[in-house]
Amino acid sequence: IILEFLFFWDAHVLFMMEKWKSRAGDRARGWFSDLGEWEALCSLAKLAADEPEWVFPKVNSVDDNTAAIVKGTSVGHPLLNEDRVANDVQLGPPGTVLLVTGSNMSGKSTLLRSVGVNIVLAQMGSVVCAKSFSLPPLHIETSMRIADSLADGVSFFMAELKRLKAIVDTAKKHDANNPKRMLFLLDEILQGTNSRERQIAVSRVVRKLIDGNAIGAISTHDLDLATTDDLAVACQTVHFAEQFEDVDGVRTMTFDYQMRQGIAETTNALKLLEMVGLGEEDDD
């Protein structure tokens, strides 16, 4: 306060700052950008140091169409602990889609998230949660956890349709000559309609994505989707399953979260109803 009163200190500081700004201010934005990039790289280096068993991915050539495949060995979700269950995953080649079926809570959505998060890490230059991982340069589009909007008057189903339309439009822009392949991850889409129309709609959406030279995966409870005329040839089917066992006379359900080939052969919705007390024997 005394310096300000005697020497107008604030005015001197302002004058010096304006002088510095005119001399070096144009370069300051670049300095802060470089500092931010350095901080991000330090974070990636810290992740590599904290997870010595993770690996750096291999990036395939964009000129090789046969290399337009995402392939990982023992891929796990980076945010889960050491008890995570890893699976071997392959998305592609173009013209195919990975169709993931399985009962509730079996691991379908977690698989898609594991693939997506590891791809993001890979394209940042980070290590990934896998024993091996290869991919081409990718542009990722997802449909997960869609939300409706009362304020905008948009229902859940309409919000999902708009999101899918945006994904399809992006796929059309990413033709074979684009430097980045488009990858889509669709988690149990179009649940807000009846099964017959859902099969038709999902088949149409996936066909448009495949025709756009995109690669990707879709999870679903619809076991008949893989047999539809549009997708029967294109689908690579995998599934997750549950196991039931009696523990002290109580019927319990467990999951091993291991991905298996083919379409799911079991469902568990009615069994879950019984387990929470909503079975037929609980009507009274």
Model-derived segments and their meaning:
Residues 1-35, 41, 47, 65:
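A conserved P-loop NTPase coupling/switch region
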Residues 44, 51-284:
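ATPase nucleotide-binding head domains, primarily ABC-like/P-loop NTPase cores
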